[in-house]
């Protein structure tokens, strides 16, 4: 059991156990010793549902990364390829299988497609003459992976680009399938709300799948009351801004991958007296970040400016607890102290780690450049000087700062102005291409197609109306003891989360005008429940809403939703699902065309 998945109103361990069971069943079909050949991208997500110990129990003796040419030598009966359905991976698999055949003792080959089998891929294997070599060709529907007690992700890195640039609906189909799996485990979700073109398509697919699913009527009492499907392009602004929560900043600066972060090792080296700092570790410090760690659960969603005081308070509590040993006089007292020692030592280690991380972040956030960048972002979001060329952006280009940093700022300005005046847009494009290279013209084209960097049409800026109606900018933010979701960006309230908040109370009818300005349709559907499964809510019992971000979600948005879940009179608790956990940098990166 993973305890951090079962603390919320919805026990996500049920989902984790279901996908683990499916994995065990597949491994047992391949009787005998096994080697797994991994599509490298899958190792992180798989690590969240099955550690090596589980694989070992089912006779997995070796694991390799999928690479061209020959497979490394392994004295096993079965070789299983775990791969995404990508054509380029089929070519590598064929190379592996063909070179293996020529090498002597025959082995059994199997292939597990994650999350779906693909006719195109199987045809490619057939064309390459190896399809017949596979005894088992199956799919493993790992659509939604539980990351935390209230968080699920498909970890589909290309979903936004596929949906909004390429018109490819594969990830939407996987999202609908994932929702079907959830409903099989947690009951039918009676009410569906949505905003955006992709949201509409996912709802349609899911309703169609439900109609076609002629199996026995789902008799599980519904855990979720509502499903809210939200397109990322309804709120393009939020991921572009710098997140200011503790977890958000860790992700902005170091990048969190599948719950792990890699950090500079020197901050974590034990300080020894008089060794002058020699023999410092050179390998990055890798830490897992989730709510299984008490301290992290407490500080992850706080504004970074509120983290220091929590850490110093914790330090006093921990040192006071260690001092207690001097007061232990009787055998019973000493035994009690010793029994608490492992927990205290873990708490001290956790505090040391997070103090080091906070120092690393502070080095960045107290720099002059961070302050200048944040000032410009906040001016844009509050509607100041969004319609002319910005001096700071000009300076960044002139000094050849990171291209992604420049693109995030230019896109933010464009979104906060409902597009840029043509001459401002042309100027930025020209400066970017001259400084960073003309090969980036394809990237600029992608950003325009995605609606991130575009000319203002009809000469009208709708952002001020949206900002005022949805109260997206709050001047008096309390970062220490927040009263509003805007604390996650020190003033800006994420548009996506404000939509969720308003849906919960007083309902979207109050903001019809703004919903019409934002892209895509908004809709409501009901899924009928069999008699006897209708929920009678107890007085004071909160509704549970599953909010699904199609195209990605940031840690700051997750923090804002957790804040709403914890409000005394909030009325709604949120479970968050997404196609990908992302930040502005990884988002822009996914839209960049790699120069040839």
Swiss-Prot record:
Annotated keywords: Autophagy, Cytoplasmic vesicle, Disease variant, Endosome, Lysosome, Membrane, Mucopolysaccharidosis, Protein transport, Transport
Top-rank taxon, per record: Eukaryota
InterPro entries: Sec-1-like_dom1 (IPR043154), Sec-1-like_dom3a (IPR043127), Sec1-like (IPR001619), Sec1-like_dom2 (IPR027482), Sec1-like_sf (IPR036045), VPS33_dom3b (IPR043155)
Membrane protein topology class: Peripheral membrane protein
Keyword field contains Transferase: no
Single GO cellular component term: lysosome
Locations listed in the record: Cytoplasmic vesicle; Late endosome membrane; Lysosome membrane; Early endosome
Effect of residue 429 to D: Disrupts interaction with VPS16. Disrupts interaction with VPS18 and impairs endosome-lysosome fusion. Disrupts interaction with VPS18 and impairs endosome-lysosome fusion
GO biological process, one term: intracellular protein transport
Coiled-coil spans in chain: none
Function: Plays a role in vesicle-mediated protein trafficking to lysosomal compartments including the endocytic membrane transport and autophagic pathways. Believed to act as a core component of the putative HOPS and CORVET endosomal tethering complexes which are proposed to be involved in the Rab5-to-Rab7 endosome conversion probably implicating MON1A/B, and via binding SNAREs and SNARE complexes to mediate tethering and docking events during SNARE-mediated membrane fusion.
Subunit composition and interactions: Core component of at least two putative endosomal tethering complexes, the homotypic fusion and vacuole protein sorting (HOPS) complex and the class C core vacuole/endosome tethering (CORVET) complex. Their common core is composed of the class C Vps proteins VPS11, VPS16, VPS18 and VPS33A, which in HOPS further associates with VPS39 and VPS41 and in CORVET with VPS8 and TGFBRAP1. Interacts with RAB5C. Interacts with UVRAG, STX17, MON1A and MON1B. Interacts with VIPAS39; however, this interaction is debated. Associates with adaptor protein complex 3 (AP-3) and clathrin. Interacts with PLEKHM1.
Record family assignment: Belongs to the STXBP/unc-18/SEC1 family.
Protein name: Vacuolar protein sorting-associated protein 33A
């Amino acid at each position: 059991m993973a305890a951090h998945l079962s603390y919320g109103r919805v026990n996500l361990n049920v989902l984790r156990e279901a996908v683990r069971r499916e994995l065990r069943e597949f491994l047992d079909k391949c009787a005998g010793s096994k080697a797994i050949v991994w599509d490298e991208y899958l190792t992180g997500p798989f690590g969240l549902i099955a550690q090596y110990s589980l694989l070992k129990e089912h006779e997995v003796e070796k694991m390799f990364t999928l690479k061209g040419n020959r497979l490394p030598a392994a004295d096993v009966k079965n070789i299983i390829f775990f791969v995404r359905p990508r054509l380029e991976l089929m070519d590598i698999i064929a190379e592996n299988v063909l070179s293996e055949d020529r090498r002597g003792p025959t082995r059994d080959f199997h292939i597990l497609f994650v999350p779906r089998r693909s006719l195109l891929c199987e045809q490619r294997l057939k064309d390459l003459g190896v399809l017949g070599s596979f005894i088992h060709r199956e799919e493993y529907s790992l659509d939604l992976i539980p990351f935390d007690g209230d968080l699920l992700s498909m970890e589909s890195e290309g979903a936004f680009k596929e949906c909004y640039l390429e018109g490819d609906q594969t990830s939407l189909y996987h999202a609908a399938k994932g929702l079907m799996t959830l409903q099989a485990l947690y009951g039918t979700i009676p009410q569906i709300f949505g905003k955006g073109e992709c949201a509409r398509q996912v709802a349609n697919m899911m309703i169609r799948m439900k109609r076609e699913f002629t199996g026995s009527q789902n008799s599980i009492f519904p855990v979720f009351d509502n499903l809210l499907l939200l397109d990322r392009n309804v709120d393009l602004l939020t991921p572009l801004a710098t997140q200011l929560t503790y977890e958000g900043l860790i992700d902005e600066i170091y990048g969190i991958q599948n719950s792990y972060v890699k950090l500079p090792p020197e901050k974590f080296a034990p300080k020894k007296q008089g060794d002058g700092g020699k023999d410092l570790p050179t390998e990055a410090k890798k830490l897992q970040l989730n709510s299984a760690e008490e301290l992290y659960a407490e500080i992850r969603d706080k504004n970074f400016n509120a983290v220091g005081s929590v850490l110093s308070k914790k330090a006093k509590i921990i040192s006071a607890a260690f001092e207690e040993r001097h007061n232990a006089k009787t055998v019973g007292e000493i035994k009690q102290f010793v029994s608490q020692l492992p927990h205290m030592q873990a708490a001290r280690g956790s505090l040391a780690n997070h103090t080091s991380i906070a120092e690393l972040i502070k080095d960045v956030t107290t720099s002059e450049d961070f302050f200048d960048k944040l000032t410009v972002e906040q001016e844009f979001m509050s509607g100041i000087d969004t319609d002319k060329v910005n001096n700071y952006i000009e300076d960044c280009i002139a000094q050849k700062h990171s291209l992604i940093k420049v693109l995030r700022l230019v896109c933010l300005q464009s979104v906060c102005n409902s597009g840029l005046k043509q001459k401002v847009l042309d100027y930025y494009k020209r400066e970017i291409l001259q400084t960073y290279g003309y090969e980036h013209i394809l990237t600029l084209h992608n950003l325009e197609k995605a609606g991130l960097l575009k000319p203002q049409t009809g000469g009208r800026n709708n952002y001020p109306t949206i900002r005022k109606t949805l109260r997206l900018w709050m001047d008096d933010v309390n970062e220490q003891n927040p009263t509003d979701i805007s604390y996650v960006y020190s003033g800006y309230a994420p548009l996506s989360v404000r939509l969720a908040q308003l849906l919960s109370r007083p309902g979207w009818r109050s903001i019809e005008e703004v919903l019409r300005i934002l892209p895509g349709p908004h809709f409501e559907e009901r899924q009928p429940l069999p008699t006897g499964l209708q929920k009678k809510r107890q007085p004071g019992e909160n509704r549970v809403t599953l909010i699904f971000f199609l195209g990605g979600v940031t840690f700051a948005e997750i923090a804002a939703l957790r804040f709403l879940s914890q409000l005394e009179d909030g009325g709604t608790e949120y479970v968050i699902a997404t196609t990908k956990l992302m930040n502005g940098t990884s988002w822009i990166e996914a839209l960049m065309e790699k120069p040839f």
